[in-house]
Structures are given as C-alpha cells and as structure tokens.
C-alpha cells in the first residue's frame, strides 16, 4: 500500500460501550505513524447524542473526525441475541454495504473493547489477496465449523479484528449470504457465537490468517488455552510479550474491579485521554 493512502478504520458501539470505543480510538491514534492519514467510522448501535459528542471531541483532539454510519436494523430482526451480545454485534456484517465511496477498497474493523498498541499502518499495508478477510484464529479453539456442519477441517476466526477487502466481499455477495445464514438459524443453541458463527460459516475458506499479536484475545493473555502445535505455542508467547492489539473479549473486562487482565492499567491510561476521563464513568472513578 502507498504511504499516502488514507487508512479507513471502522468500529461499532452501543451507548454503553461508547466510552470504551473512545479509549480504543485514543490508543490507535496515539500509536500510529503520524505521517499517515486515517479516517474513522462508527456504526451507530444506539449511541446517545451526549456520548457521540464526547467521542467526536476525543478524536478531534488528534485532528481526526468521526463519520457515523446507520444500519438498516430490519435486516437483523431475526438475529439471535443473548445476555451479553446485542444485535449491534451483527452490524459489522453490513460494513461494505454502508460505504458508498467506490474509491475505498478496504477497511479495518476493530471491536470497541480493544487497545491498539502498535502502528495500525503495519496491518493496513498487508496484502491479503486473494482472500476476502484477514483475521486471527479464535483462541477458544472452538469446533464450531464442525458443530455447524460447515466443514470437518479448517480454522475458525475471531471477528473482533478484521481486514475486509470490499471488492471480494461485494463480488461474492457476502453480506446477503451471511444474513441468509442468520435467518435460516434463528436459534441461540445453534448460533452460539452469534455474528462470528455466521461469518465463519460463509468465509471459513476465504480468510487470511494473521499472527495472533493482531488480536491478543483474553484466552491468550491469561494463558487459558494452549495451542497443540509448537508454532502455535511460540506465537502465543510472542503475543503475550508484545501484543499489537489487545482484545478484551469475554468476561475479563478491564473496567471490572476484579479483573486479572495484565493490560488493565493500559486501558485506564488511554481512557484518561478521553472525554470520559472524569465524567460519569464508574470505570475511571472506582
């Protein structure tokens, strides 16, 4: 990729997670190559006006505005929800359809419960052709592809951080295929991992595998899972020593007082530079 190329980064949040998205954006903007240009997008999962204002004020301190994207929520009326996963989690599926500017060829999607600790241009500049997405294998070592009768082989990716190639995605009508899969399986006992299950069911053989440093999941950071291969164990050690993106997936959120996550202090560090640093944020004030 050219160094003068604009990097397009998108995330999604509801009102409860808007503050954590602010922290993620601060970490990204702080640690990126300052000679590169970035555009930020937020899929609006119901963020209230005051929190939108705080988000915008947070990133404008770095000279970077936010473009908010609206999803047709009717597309996801049959999507399975749970106590900790709302329909907003599915909205990433619509990303290539929400972007009308044909000059934008790809985007990086990053979950809002993450910290970007390395220059994001290193990820942006990766050539992932001929694949549709690039992602990290899910550290839970799930047998979801087999359990969903998709395939007996292949790896299952975590959808929290993805490079999305728009041309490949649109050419294959991936959004339509994923939504059809969701509508065909409106059962929480089937779509156990929600949007991630549906994305994997369609893209299981079309994704480029990234080093786990680019999605340092809680399973890895807390040594809750051990890969079966020597290479896998080596990569997990490298990830713990030097994570590029820390993803606070699962229940070990840094804003919970009882968390054992080793990057909890870094979370509070980046949150201190947001507009939630002292206002109405129990995570900061506890």
Swiss-Prot record:
Stretch forming the signal peptide: none
Keyword list, A-Z: Glycosyltransferase, Manganese, Metal-binding, Nucleotide-binding, Stress response, Transferase
Positions with a binding annotation for UDP: 12-17, 111-112, 247-253
A Pfam family this chain is assigned to: Glyco_transf_8
Keyword Manganese recorded: yes
GO MF entry, a single one: glycosyltransferase activity
Binding-site positions, Mn(2+): 111, 113, 247
Induction conditions: By different stresses such as heat shock and salt stress and by starvation.
Family to which this protein belongs: Belongs to the glycosyltransferase 8 family.
Name of this chain's protein: General stress protein A
Gene: gspA
């Amino acid at each position: 990729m050219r160094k003068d190329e604009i990097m397009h980064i998108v995330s999604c949040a509801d009102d409860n997670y808007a503050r954590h998205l602010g922290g993620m954006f601060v970490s990204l903007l702080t640690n990126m190559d300052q000679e590169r240009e970035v555009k930020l997008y937020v899929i609006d999962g119901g963020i209230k006006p005051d929190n939108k204002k705080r988000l915008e004020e947070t990133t404008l301190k770095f000279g970077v505005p936010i473009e908010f994207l609206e999803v047709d929520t009717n597309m996801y009326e049959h999507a399975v929800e749970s106590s900790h996963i709302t329909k907003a989690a599915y909205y990433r599926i619509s990303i290539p359809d929400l972007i009308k500017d044909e000059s934008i060829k790809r985007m990086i999607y990053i979950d809002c419960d993450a910290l970007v600790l390395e220059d994001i241009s290193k990820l942006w500049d990766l050539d992932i052709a001929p694949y549709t997405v690039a992602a990290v294998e899910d550290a839970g070592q799930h047998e979801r592809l087999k359990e969903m009768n998709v395939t007996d082989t292949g790896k299952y990716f975590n959808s929290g951080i993805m490079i999305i190639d728009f041309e490949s995605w649109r050419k294959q009508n991936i959004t339509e295929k994923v939504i059809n899969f969701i509508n065909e399986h409106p059962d929480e006992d089937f779509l156990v991992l929600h949007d991630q299950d549906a994305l994997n069911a369609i893209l299981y053989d079309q994704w480029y595998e990234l080093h786990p440093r680019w999605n340092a999941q809680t399973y890895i950071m807390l040594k809750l899972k051990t890969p079966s291969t020597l290479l896998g164990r080596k990569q997990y050690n490298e990830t713990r020593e030097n994570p590029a993106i820390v993803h606070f997936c699962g229940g070990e959120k840094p804003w919970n007082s009882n968390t054992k996550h080793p990057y909890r202090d870094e979370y509070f560090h980046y949150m201190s530079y947001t507009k939630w640093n002292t206002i109405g944020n129990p995570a900061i004030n506890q």
